[in-house]
Amino acid sequence: MQYTPDTAWKITGFSREISPAYRQKLLSLGMLPGSSFNVVRVAPLGDPIHIETRRVSLVLRKKDLALLEVEAVSC
């Protein structure tokens, strides 16, 4: 998945490899299936990635974002 600044993504679900504890943490931060997030900034080497949901602003590693099933949303 190529995350670039000023792109929007919709969460469709979670990967089967995600641990229940980490899944619960993401859910508590508002990363719910059906919700969307915007990519704010990408670090110079591509990792980590700054995203914003309706509730919070997060900085996640690529490997953590890979645990989310997402689809691009047209702005």
Swiss-Prot record:
This is Fe(2+) transport protein A. SMART domains: FeoA. The keyword Cytoplasm applies. Belongs to the FeoA family. It comes from the Bacteria. It is found in: Cytoplasm. PANTHER family: FE(2+) TRANSPORT PROTEIN A. The gene is feoA. It comes from Escherichia coli (strain K12). GO terms for biological process: DNA damage response; iron ion transport. Its main location: cytoplasm. GO terms for cellular component: cytoplasm. Disruption phenotype: Reduced uptake of Fe(2+). Monomer. Gene3D superfamilies: 2.30.30.90. Keywords: Cytoplasm, Ion transport, Iron, Iron transport, Transport. Coiled coil: none annotated. Induction: Induced by hydroxyurea. Pfam families: FeoA.
